[in-house]
């Protein structure tokens, strides 16, 4: 009988085993050369890692392919403002801001902000900038000037009184001056590149200079509040020191638990070193690829370390079991490689595919995260599957540790793993299914409450009591505007000057009035409302005339409001922006406002007038939220499809695919439910966590099923095979899950809220994925007929074949295994 008459599962298993055997022999035979090569690569990439820099960027956070962002880019030159910083000075003394101390501080603070590198100096607004002016009606006609005259002296009471009158006439109360006249605002817009250097703007440097401004004027009896993307990046970066501290704590916790688990200093050190190697290689490779690391993806190296620990523990555990059976360190290393190369590599490739799937979201920061994580996992195949067996081949286990393990093995090992065999029997499996179905029903219902976008006010990346969020609350309370603004672009065609055509202005007026009544909107500004102020002024300031005339001549009276220099429209009003200031930037608020804009545009069509979304930072958030929402289902389908494909290719069994994928699917649904319960929104920072959790969680199922399949094909029953799989692979999997659960659990005390959220979600997925593999996988195997299917493959494999690899050694039905104790 030849290979053509044997089932493909048997043929592929033989060929794969022969390939693995050849690889094991090659690695052991050339271990000195390979070890020197790995050491050289480590030194070179370690040196390269010293050149790694933090690389934040505003445009990296934006889905530039989204229709909203195409509109945003089209009018970025005419209507900038998505990347804005607000600096508010609040007088803490008696009276209001019209005193010498405060006005001097405001003047100097305006200059300080003006000269920050990267600030668009034509877009700085303050009482002391020449682009802020007032207009009044006199007996001689209109008169206007800058709010603060050029010869202003803060020590002159008459000048202070004049500025007070000018501010009242300028309409800046609630905008650049607080509603209670106790604070004043400096608003500036940033460029993405520094004009002086031509390089990407250094947001860290901008944040440091803003903090210097705060410190300088806080000494003068003034409260300084600062918000904006640059300041947020600075606060996140300042929290990175805490992130590194938590990484160090997690490392120490992992080391302590690993030593308690292995009772071996040597294997503990080897596992930690090999788990750190892909992190070092990754950090060294990024500068060579022209990449940095964004503050929002600073957690990726720890994920790589966690995955590395998981696979290193499996390898050292298999090596130790071989030593217990009497093998030499070299033979034990070869045996460990032979057993774990296939499941370990498949698990890592699955992780890498999961990270690649993240790149479906067309946002640069997410794609960089996917590239970084994928590269780190691929490097781990070399460090864990090649370098670690080489190191183990040179290592001798401590005599006391080896003797203890041999005594345990001689006593029959620990009986606790045999208890798990009950879940591989049909009757108890029904109980597992009942619990799983109940969790599925609850998770499905609860996950429907999951919101897309931010939840809560302020910056969700930081805690509610952080300085940034306190500043945000103060500015939102004191002014009618904030940093959260949505810009709607009104495009006009076929008009010489659209602002002088009543149908156009009427459509904008009706749109503005409609949006003022929308929940979540704080205030609305447009050329329509500003034009009505000037028209009333033309008529002796009579408020009854604050309306839109139906003739072009009448609208001409408001032409001062239609000046492109005001930043509200382009020449001839070909494009007009309507600014909608929102009360917050929660995902539900943004979605509701966007829906209302679309509804108005659909129900109120105006010839040659189109309402286009969107600009402003809220427009960016709207595009990002929609991109995340659109990508969620596609991402999950892609990653589960990739996992299913790899499992099908590896195990040649649809039953194996279901046994591994079904628990992962349940955990993903439960993860969404946990996010909804904890008030964590689905956004750029959290969506990758779900994918990462699935990628890491699949390791447990692959390792357990591979051993289960091996024992079944050598004559074991399903319960016995699963008990042995738990003995040989489950110990390490359980340790890894608990260790990573504790490690990321410490993130709950971080100052960075996004690290807290990621820690909670990862801890949940690490632990619950293990439960899925331990309880649901054997239950599915019991009812899917895995034992019968593998028995058929075994029988076909046992039939004689003229082509049999001479190097393959028959394995016993159940190789002795012992927990590492």
Which residue stretches match the model-derived regions?
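Juxtamembrane segments of multi-pass membrane proteins
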Residues: 419-552
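Hydrophobic, glycine/alanine-rich multi-pass transmembrane helices and their short helix-loop junctions
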Residues: 257, 286-289, 345-388, 392, ...
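Helix-loop junctions and hydrophobic alpha-helical segments within the transmembrane domains
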Residues: 322-349, 712-735
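Extracytoplasmic
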Residues: 77, 104, 153-265, 276, ...
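Signature of alpha-helical transmembrane segments and their immediate interfacial
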Residues: 4-56, 390, 394, 398, ...
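Membrane-proximal extracytoplasmic
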Residues: 2-255
